[in-house]
C-alpha cells in the first residue's frame, strides 16, 4: 500500500504525557513547541489518564464535533468513536503548555476488564509473564494494548498517510511487539531514557558497572532483582521497534549490552532555551536571587552567623533521592575533604552546600521556622528604628536655621536612639541566641526515618555539623523548592540562578537535566563522564577546556572511586579560589553554551530517527522520493555518513566547537554521532517539515472552535 511519507502522522506515547512524574515529562514538555510547529495537527501525544491531575494539565476539547478535526485527521476521530463504542473512556484536548499539543489520555480503569485476556495474549505472543500484584506492569500492559488498538484503528481507516509511532520507556513499550505481531501498518521508534537493569545494578553499589557490562548475565540479574518480567518488556520493545534510540552515548553502550541491540542513534535531550534566556540580565538575576538565599542563610545560622556573606559561595546538588546513582555520597565526602583543605589553608571563604532531594518528612522543623521568623522580626525592628532615626534627623535639620540653634546635627548614637528603641533591639538580638553548645541544624525538616537516612548518616560520618570552625556548612532540604516555601521562598529555577555552582557527580545518569539547566542559566556545574550530558559536552568542547566554560567533568569511569573524589575536591577548591571577576567571566562563558542545548538543534535528531523509521518501513517509496539508494544501518549513515569536524579554536579559553567546520577529527556526540546543524534542509528531504513554520503567526488554537 502506498502512503504519503512527507505528510506522515506522528503519535508519541509515554506515561508522563500531561502527568508529571520524572524527567520524561520535561523532555516532552520542552520539545512540544518545535514538534507542533513542524507537524501542526498531524501530531498527537498519547498517555494514561491521571484522574487526580489531568484537569490542571489539559484543556478538554469536544472531539465529537465535526470541526474538531481537519479532513485529513478524520480517521483519528473515527478511531476514537469506535473505541468509545467498545467502552473505552478517554480525554481528548490540548496540553496546557507552550505549543499546546493535542493529547489523548486513555482511562485505564475503563479497560481493566480486559486485563486477564490481554496478559494471557502477551504470554502467548511473546512469552512475557506478568505477576498479579505488580500494578505498574499491569498498567503498562493495559496502556500498551489500548494504544496498539488505537493505532490499528487509525492505520485501517487512514490509507493515505504514513504513521510514525514513537514510544518512550518500557512503561509505554508493550505496544511495540503488538504492532509487530499484528502487522499494523505503522513505523515505530523506541527510546529508552535509562535501562531498568542499569538502574538496579548501579544502585546496588557493588558493581563496576561501565567496565563489567559485557560480562553481565542479564537474565540472572533481572531475576535477582525481581524485575525479570519488566526487563522482558523493555527488551521486547527494543527489538520490535523499527528504530531503537537512547538519549546519550553512554546509555547506548549500556543498552547494547543489557538489551542486546545496538541503538540506531542518539536522541539527546534539549531545553527550551527561550524560557531561560535573560540576555544581559542574567548576572543581575544572579545577584537578586542570591540575596534571597542570603536571607535564608541568615535565619538558618542565627546565633552562629559568624561568616561574611560577601565571601560565601553557594553549592548545591538536586534531583531524585538516589543516593549513589545521583552521587550524593560522593558530594558529601568531597565536601568534607574540601572543608579540611580550606581550614588548613586558612581560607576566609565559606561554602554553604545545599542538598535538595525529596525524602519522607513531616514538614519543617520548629527550629527552621523559628529562625526565619526571628531574623525577619529583627529586620522589621531595625527598619522601624532607622525610620525613626531618619525622622529625628530630618526634624532637627529643618528647625535648625530658624531657631537660632548653633549646634551641629546630632551624631551621637545615644542622642539618636531612644531607650525604647534600645530595648526593642536588645530583645530581638537576645532572641537570636542559641542554647550553649547548640549548632545550626543540617536538615530543615522533621525526617520520618532520621536514624536510617543515608544522606544524614553520611553527613554524620564525615562530621559536617556546621561548627563555627567549619568552612563548609551543610543544609539538607528534603523537598523540592517552590515559591510558597515559608523558609526558602524560591522556585527551583530562581534558586539555581542564585547559586554559584551546581555539583552533580552522578554515577548513573543517562542524560542529566540539572547540569543542562545550570548551563542555560549561566551557572557553572560539575558533572561526570558517565552522565549523558557530561559525555556530550566533553565531545563538544576541546579537551581540557570544558572547565573554562564552567563545565567541570569528573572521571568516574576510568578512575578509582577515591581518585574521582579527589578530582571533585580539586575542582571545587579551584572554584572557591576564583575571584569574583573570574566567576563573572566564567558565568558569561557558561551562558554562551545555551544554544548547544536548544531543541532547535537537538530536535533535528528526532527528524533523523523518523526518517530512518520511514526508510525501513517503506524502502521502495523512500528510495523513489529521495532519488538515490541510502544506507539505513543507523541514523548517521542514513544522513550520508557525514563527519562532524571542528577547527582548533584560536581564542583562549577555547570556543565551543563550530559544528559546520571541516578541519579536525572530532565528532559529536561520540561514535554514534549526531548531525545537529551540519545538515541543511535538503538533507532532511522535507519529511514532515513545514518550512514556513517559523513564520506562522497562528496560535495553537487557530483550528479550534
Curated annotation (Swiss-Prot):
Biological or metabolic pathway of the protein: Glycan biosynthesis; glycogen biosynthesis
Predominant localisation class: cytoplasm
Annotated binding of UDP-alpha-D-glucose, by residue: 193, 199, 320, 509, 511-512
InterPro entries, per the entry: Glycogen_synth
Keyword Glycosyltransferase on entry: yes
EC number in record: 2.4.1.11
Pfam families: Glycogen_syn
Gene Ontology biological-process entries: glycogen biosynthetic process
Regulation: Allosteric activation by glucose-6-phosphate, and phosphorylation by a cAMP-dependent kinase.
Post-translational modification: Phosphorylated by the cyclin-CDK PCL10-PHO85. Phosphorylation causes inactivation of enzyme.
Residues binding alpha-D-glucose 6-phosphate: 280-281, 283, 286, 290, 500, 583, 587
Family matches, as SUPFAM superfamilies: UDP-Glycosyltransferase/glycogen phosphorylase
Annotated positions of the Phosphoserine modification: 159, 363, 467, 651, 655, 661, 663
GO molecular function term, any single one: identical protein binding
Residue span of region Disordered: 686-705
Single GO cellular component term: glycogen granule
Binding site for UDP: 20, 320, 514
Assembly behavior: Interacts with PCL10.
Function: Glycogen synthase participates in the glycogen biosynthetic process along with glycogenin and glycogen branching enzyme. Extends the primer composed of a few glucose units formed by glycogenin by adding new glucose units to it. In this context, glycogen synthase transfers the glycosyl residue from UDP-Glc to the non-reducing end of alpha-1,4-glucan.
Family stated for the protein in its record: Belongs to the glycosyltransferase 3 family.
Further remark: Present with 14600 molecules/cell in log phase SD medium.
Identification of the protein by name: Glycogen [starch] synthase isoform 2
UniProt lineage: Eukaryota, Fungi, Dikarya, Ascomycota, Saccharomycotina
The gene coding this protein: GSY2
Amino acid at each position: 500500500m502506498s502512503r504519503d511519507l512527507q505528510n506522515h502522522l506522528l503519535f508519541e506515547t509515554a506515561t508522563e504525557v500531561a502527568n508529571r512524574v520524572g524527567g520524561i515529562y520535561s523532555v516532552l514538555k520542552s520539545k512540544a513547541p518545535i514538534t507542533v510547529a513542524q507537524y501542526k495537527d498531524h501530531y498527537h501525544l498519547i498517555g494514561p489518564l491521571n484522574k487526580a491531575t489531568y484537569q490542571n494539565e489539559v484543556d478538554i476539547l469536544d472531539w465529537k464535533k465535526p470541526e474538531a478535526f481537519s479532513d485529513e485527521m478524520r480517521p483519528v476521530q473515527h478511531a476514537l468513536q469506535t473505541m468509545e463504542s467498545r467502552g473505552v473512556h478517554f480525554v481528548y484536548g490540548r496540553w496546557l503548555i507552550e505549543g499546546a499539543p493535542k493529547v489523548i489520555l486513555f482511562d485505564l480503569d475503563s479497560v481493566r476488564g480486559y486485563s486477564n485476556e490481554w496478559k494471557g495474549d502477551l504470554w502467548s505472543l511473546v512469552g512475557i509473564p506478568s505477576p498479579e500484584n505488580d500494578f505498574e506492569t499491569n498498567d503498562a500492559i493495559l496502556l500498551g494494548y489500548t494504544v496498539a488498538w488505537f493505532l490499528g484503528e487509525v492505520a485501517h481507516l487512514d490509507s493515505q498517510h504514513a504513521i510514525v509511532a514513537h514510544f518512550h520507556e518500557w512503561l509505554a513499550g508493550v505496544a511495540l511487539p503488538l504492532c509487530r505481531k499484528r502487522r499494523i501498518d505503522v513505523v515505530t521508534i523506541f527510546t529508552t531514557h535509562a535501562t531498568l537493569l542499569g538502574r538496579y545494578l548501579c544502585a546496588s553499589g557493588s558493581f563496576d558497572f561501565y567496565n563489567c557490562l559485557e560480562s553481565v548475565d542479564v537474565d540472572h540479574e533481572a531475576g535477582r532483582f525481581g524485575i525479570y518480567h519488566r526487563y522482558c518488556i523493555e527488551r521486547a520493545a527494543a527489538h520490535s521497534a523499527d528504530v531503537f534510540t537512547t538519549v546519550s552515548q553512554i546509555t547506548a553502550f549500556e543498552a547494547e549490552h543489557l538489551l542486546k541491540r545496538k541503538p540506531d542513534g542518539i536522541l539527546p535531550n534539549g531545553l527550551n532555551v527561550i524560557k531561560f534566556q535573560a540576555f544581559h540580565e542574567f548576572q543581575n538575576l544572579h545577584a537578586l536571587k542570591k540575596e534571597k538565599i542570603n536571607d535564608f542563610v541568615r535565619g538558618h545560622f542565627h546565633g552562629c552567623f559568624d561568616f561574611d556573606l560577601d565571601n560565601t559561595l553557594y553549592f548545591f546538588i538536586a534531583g531524585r533521592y538516589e543516593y549513589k546513582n545521583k552521587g550524593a555520597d560522593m558530594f558529601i565526602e568531597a565536601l568534607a575533604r574540601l572543608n579540611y583543605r580550606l581550614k588548613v589553608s586558612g581560607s576566609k571563604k565559606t561554602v554553604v552546600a545545599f542538598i535538595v532531594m525529596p525524602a519522607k518528612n513531616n514538614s519543617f522543623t520548629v527550629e527552621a521556622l523559628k529562625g526565619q521568623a526571628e531574623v525577619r522580626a529583627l529586620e522589621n525592628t531595625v527598619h522601624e528604628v532607622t525610620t525613626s532615626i531618619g525622622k529625628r534627623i530630618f526634624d532637627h535639620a529643618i528647625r535648625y536655621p530658624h531657631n537660632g540653634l548653633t549646634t551641629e546635627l546630632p551624631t551621637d548614637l545615644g542622642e539618636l536612639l531612644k531607650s525604647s528603641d534600645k530595648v526593642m533591639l536588645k530583645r530581638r538580638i537576645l532572641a537570636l541566641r542559641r542554647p550553649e553548645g547548640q549548632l545550626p541544624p543540617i536538615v530543615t525538616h522533621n525526617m520520618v526515618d532520621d536514624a536510617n537516612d543515608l544522606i544524614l548518616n553520611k553527613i554524620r560520618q564525615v562530621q559536617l555539623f556546621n561548627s563555627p570552625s567549619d568552612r563548609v556548612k551543610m543544609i539538607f532540604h528534603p523537598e523540592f523548592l517552590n515559591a510558597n516555601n515559608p523558609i526558602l521562598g524560591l522556585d527551583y529555577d530562581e534558586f539555581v540562578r542564585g547559586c554559584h555552582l551546581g555539583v552533580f557527580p552522578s554515577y548513573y545518569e543517562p542524560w542529566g537535566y540539572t547540569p543542562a539547566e545550570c548551563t542555560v542559566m549561566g551557572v557553572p556545574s560539575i558533572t561526570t563522564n558517565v552522565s549523558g550530558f557530561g559525555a556530550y559536552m566533553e565531545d563538544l568542547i576541546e579537551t581540557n577546556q570544558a572547565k573554562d566554560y564552567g563545565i567541570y567533568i569528573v572521571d568516574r569511569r576510568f578512575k578509582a572511586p577515591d581518585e574521582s573524589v579527589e578530582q571533585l575536591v580539586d575542582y571545587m577548591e579551584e572554584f572557591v579560589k576564583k575571584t569574583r571577576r573570574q566567576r563573572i567571566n566564567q558565568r558569561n562563558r557558561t551562558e554562551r553554551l545555551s544554544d548547544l542545548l536548544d531543541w532547535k538543534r537537538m530536535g533535528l535528531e528526532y527528524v533523523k530517527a523518523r526518517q530512518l523509521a520511514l526508510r525501513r518501513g517503506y524502502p521502495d517509496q523512500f528510495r523513489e522520493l529521495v532519488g538515490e539508494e541510502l544506507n539505513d544501518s543507523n541514523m548517521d549513515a542514513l544522513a550520508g555518513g557525514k563527519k562532524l569536524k571542528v577547527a582548533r579554536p584560536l581564542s583562549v579559553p577555547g570556543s565551543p566547537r563550530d559544528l559546520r567546520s571541516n578541519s579536525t577529527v572530532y565528532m559529536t556526540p561520540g561514535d554514534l554521532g549526531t548531525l545537529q546543524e551540519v545538515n541543511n534542509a535538503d538533507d532532511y528531504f522535507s519529511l514532515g517539515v513545514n518550512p514556513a513554520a517559523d513564520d506562522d503567526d497562528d496560535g495553537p488554537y487557530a483550528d479550534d472552535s
